[in-house]
A protein has these predicted regions:
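Short, charged recognition helix plus adjacent turn
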Residues: 73-104
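DNA major-groove recognition helix of helix-turn-helix/homeodomain DNA-binding modules
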Residues: 59-80
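DNA major-groove recognition helix of helix-turn-helix
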Residues: 39, 49-50, 60, 68
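Short alpha-helical DNA-recognition segment
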Residues: 29-48
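Short basic helix-loop element that most often maps to the first helix and adjoining turn
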Residues: 19-35, 63, 96-98
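A short, Lys/Arg-rich alpha-helix, primarily the initiator
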Residues: 2-27
Length: 104
């Protein structure tokens, strides 16, 4: 399977989201344990992501991105990260061109 984006592009997107995790989570008033359950990781693992002790996988990034983008309040916060949403959509759009699926 070919890589859709290179490793440094993925790391940049992951770092951007990681830096925003505490604010995003607080904006919707849920605990680390609750969000960990939603995305299928332990609370300890999520906590390690949030404080930067562990880098999340690309799949975990996508789970968190979709979780936060689907909430109106956190969606607005993500829009303040200049170009972040557009960059993620470009990655997803590239993938979809190969599978004939279109994203907004």
């Amino acid at each position: 399977m070919e890589n859709i984006v290179n490793k440094s592009e993925k790391e940049e997107l992951i770092q951007t989201l990681t830096g925003a995790l505490p604010v995003l989570r607080a904006a919707i008033g849920i605990s680390q344990g609750e969000i960990a359950e939603y995305i299928g990781v332990s609370r300890q693992t999520y906590c390690a992501f949030e404080i930067g002790k562990r880098q999340m996988s690309w799949n975990t990034f996508l789970s968190l991105f979709l979780f936060f983008i689907s909430n109106a309040e956190t969606n607005n916060l993500l829009k303040t990260k200049k170009g972040f949403i557009t960059q993620v959509y470009k990655v997803l759009q590239y993938k979809s061109e190969q599978n004939s699926v279109q994203y907004p």
